[in-house]
């Protein structure tokens, strides 16, 4: 669906299916999907993360699947959508841009990784390792930002921006949300081929005053709560 133009998605799934099947609108879709693929780095840069219809496609590029099916990549993309869709990992970011943005004082650290059951499909490894990657790669190894700046971007800055009082800081009266780690031990283990791996080096995590990770292991506690803007 990431390659499908918005006009084709108007009025829901049934209308999208009709447009993909109608010769006139399908020709238009093929042209626009081809353009969208090119803007995203090409078919070889699009990796299937999860396919409910055909799990054998997971981990393969759209280019590989198209070659296997003897189709143009844009045709394959439309066929995958018609069959129920698939989630993708897209390699189309500039490392220089990422580091420049990371250095800005207003940049917060987050992730749009999907919340899928552990072991289900091949989601982007950021689902498990986004924050560990920043601490390991961009703080410790590449020294793009300081540890203090990185921690602020993950804690007090988001809390301030979203109006979450008594969050993101360690002080009397604030909620006890704590992460205890040694910077030199933080290590991202999730990969594109094996993404369901929890990052290493987090000794303890406390949520709302309750320990949820102890000695690197999950406890059975679930003290999290939905936060609303104050």
Feature annotation, model-predicted:
Residues 1-143:
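Active-site neighborhoods of metal-dependent hydrolases
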Residues 88-98, 142-151, 159-196:
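Acidic, glycine-enriched loop/beta-strand segments at the rims
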Residues 1, 55, 83-87, 115-119, ...:
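Flexible loop/turn segments at secondary-structure boundaries
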Residues 74, 132, 148-155:
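Hydrophobic face of alpha-helices
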Residues 67, 82, 102, 106, ...:
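Hydrophobic alpha-helix feature that most strongly marks membrane-spanning transmembrane helices
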Residues 28, 100-106, 111-112, 180-227:
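C-terminal cap of metal-dependent C-N hydrolases
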């Amino acid at each position: 669906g990431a390659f499908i133009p918005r006009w084709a998605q108007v009025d829901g799934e049934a209308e999208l299916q009709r447009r993909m099947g109608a010769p006139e609108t399908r020709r238009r879709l093929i042209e626009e999907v081809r353009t969208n693929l090119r803007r995203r780095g090409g078919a070889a840069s699009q990796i299937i993360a999860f396919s409910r219809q055909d799990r054998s496609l997971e981990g393969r590029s759209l280019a590989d699947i198209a070659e296997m099916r003897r189709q143009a990549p844009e045709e394959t993309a439309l066929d995958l959508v018609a069959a129920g869709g698939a989630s993708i990992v897209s390699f189309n970011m500039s490392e220089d841009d990422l580091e420049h943005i990371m250095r800005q004082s207003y940049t917060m650290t987050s992730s749009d990784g999907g919340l899928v059951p552990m072991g289900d499909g091949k989601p982007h490894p950021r689902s498990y390792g986004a924050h560990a990657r920043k601490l390991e790669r961009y703080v410790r190894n590449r020294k793009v930002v300081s540890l203090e700046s990185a921690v602020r971007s993950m804690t007090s800055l988001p809390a301030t921006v979203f109006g979450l009082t008594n969050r993101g800081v360690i002080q009397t009266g604030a909620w006890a949300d704590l992460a205890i780690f040694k910077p030199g031990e933080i290590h991202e283990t999730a990969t594109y081929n094996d993404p369901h791996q929890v990052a290493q080096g987090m000794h303890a995590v406390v949520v709302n005053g309750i320990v949820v990770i102890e000695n690197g292991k999950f406890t059975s506690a679930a003290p999290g709560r939905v936060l609303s803007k104050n």
